[in-house]
Amino acid sequence: MAGKGQRDHVILGNDQTGERIYLTSKNRRNTPDRLVLKKYSPKLHKVVEFKEVK
């Protein structure tokens, strides 16, 4: 049986609107700090920074 992998599922949230609409995965060995990605916000109708919540 395979062991637990290095990738974790993380939820991305926006501080301005409180949205938590993106789910992605990251390698916890390569990126131990919180993940920040620019994604589209449907409420603001523009691309903003979404930060790791979980």
Curated annotation (Swiss-Prot):
GO biological process, one term: translation
Superkingdom of origin: Bacteria
Cleaved signal peptide residues: none
Keyword field contains Cell membrane: no
Residues annotated as transmembrane: none
An MF annotation (GO) of this entry: structural constituent of ribosome
Keyword Ribonucleoprotein: yes
Keyword entries, A-Z: Ribonucleoprotein, Ribosomal protein
Coiled coil: none
Entry-linked Gene3D superfamilies: Ribosomal protein L33 (2.20.28.120)
InterPro entries: Ribosomal_bL33, Ribosomal_bL33_CS, Ribosomal_bL33_sf, Ribosomal_zn-bd
PROSITE patterns given in the database record: RIBOSOMAL_L33 (PS00582)
GO cellular component labels: cytoplasm; ribonucleoprotein complex; ribosome
Pfam families for the chain: Ribosomal_L33 (PF00471)
Entry similarity comment: Belongs to the bacterial ribosomal protein bL33 family.
The protein's name: Large ribosomal subunit protein bL33
Organism in which the protein naturally occurs: Oenococcus oeni (strain ATCC BAA-331 / PSU-1)
Gene giving rise to this polypeptide: rpmG
